[in-house]
């Protein structure tokens, strides 16, 4: 049985930990509000960009003049996985679930005889994936500590991806991130970004058979050559915003659970402490009474 001193030290330690987890929960809640607003405000722009591109590309997909960012290289041999996680832990399964999705995808591709290359954004994804895919990791970036992600940072990542694609380093690129739904729901997501995965629209479905005659100046090809790289940056930026909100939501939930568990542990240890102290007092009283009777 632990001594009273051990129990007091244990209770003090748990109380100190509870203060830390409570503070982290409050910080995550404050950051979540900003991150959630940014993610929700970014979704319509990213979705509208994809919709505009889908309408423009309706007659070009699969055609000879289609940009390579839209039609791809025509091959499916080398895959680039862009895995976006966080730099910090204590966020529940946020980081591990994204890394697990990317790992399973990589294993499936390698089992099919494909070549896999990995680019990580965030320290935690790098820490997990390099255990198994050290030779496949070709680039890694941190999220810059506690600074909120911004468009220039997303542009750096997108420019690197685009440069590697134009250099012929891969055929298909897939982006891995966590889509924010709510504080308790973040969905690990895989999105193909090269060739661009565009939504099906009425214009794209009708294509050349549409009765509406539309002329573009400049041509669709020229517009797409300009917009597709922008769309790549927008999709990366959206993924980073979704990740930021998901990370804070997961951390807030995890720290709330840790705080409540610490409270339960304090109650349990305090009860044990009181029972142990009562037993010791009772034992001492019995010894005193027994000694008095012996006299």
Swiss-Prot record:
It is found in: Cell inner membrane. This is ATP synthase gamma chain. The gene is atpG. It holds the Pfam family ATP-synt. InterPro entries: ATP_synth_F1_ATPase_gsu, ATP_synth_F1_gsu, ATP_synth_F1_gsu_CS. Keywords: ATP synthesis, Cell inner membrane, Cell membrane, CF(1), Hydrogen ion transport, Ion transport, Membrane, Transport. PANTHER family: ATP SYNTHASE GAMMA CHAIN, ATP SYNTHASE SUBUNIT GAMMA, MITOCHONDRIAL. HAMAP family: ATP_synth_gamma_bact. The keyword Membrane applies. It is a peripheral membrane protein. Its main location: membrane. It comes from Methylorubrum populi (strain ATCC BAA-705 / NCIMB 13946 / BJ001). It comes from the Bacteria. The keyword Amino-acid biosynthesis does not apply.
């Amino acid at each position: 049985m632990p001594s009273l001193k051990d129990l007091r030290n244990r209770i003090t330690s748990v109380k100190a930990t509870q203060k830390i987890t409570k503070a982290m929960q409050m910080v995550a809640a404050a950051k979540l509000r900003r991150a959630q607003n940014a993610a929700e405000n970014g979704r319509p722009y990213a979705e509208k960009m994809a919709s505009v591109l889908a309408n423009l590309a309706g007659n070009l997909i699969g055609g000879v003049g289609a940009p390579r960012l839209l039609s791809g290289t025509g091959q499916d041999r080398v895959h680039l996985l862009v895995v976006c996680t966080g730099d910090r832990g204590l966020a529940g399964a946020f980081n591990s679930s994204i890394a697990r999705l990317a790992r399973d995808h990589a294993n499936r591709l390698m089992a099919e005889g494909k070549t896999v290359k990995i680019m990580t954004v965030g320290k935690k994804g790098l820490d997990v994936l390099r255990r198994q895919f050290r030779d496949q990791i070709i680039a890694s970036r941190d999220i810059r500590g506690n600074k909120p992600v911004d468009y220039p940072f997303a542009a750096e990542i997108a420019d690197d991806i685009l440069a590697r694609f134009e250099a012929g380093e891969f055929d298909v690129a897939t982006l891995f991130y966590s889509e924010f739904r709510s504080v308790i729901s973040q969905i690990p997501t895989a999105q193909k970004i090269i060739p661009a995965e565009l939504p099906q629209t009425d214009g794209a479905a009708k294509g050349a058979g549409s009765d509406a005659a539309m002329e573009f100046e400049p041509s669709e090809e020229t517009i797409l050559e300009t917009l597709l790289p922008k769309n790549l940056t927008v999709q990366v930026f959206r993924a980073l915003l979704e990740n930021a909100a998901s990370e804070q939501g997961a951390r807030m939930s995890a720290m709330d659970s840790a705080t409540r568990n610490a409270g339960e542990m304090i109650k349990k240890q305090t009860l044990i402490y009181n029972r142990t102290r009562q037993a010791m007092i009772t034992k001492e009283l019995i010894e005193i009474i027994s000694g008095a009777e012996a006299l």
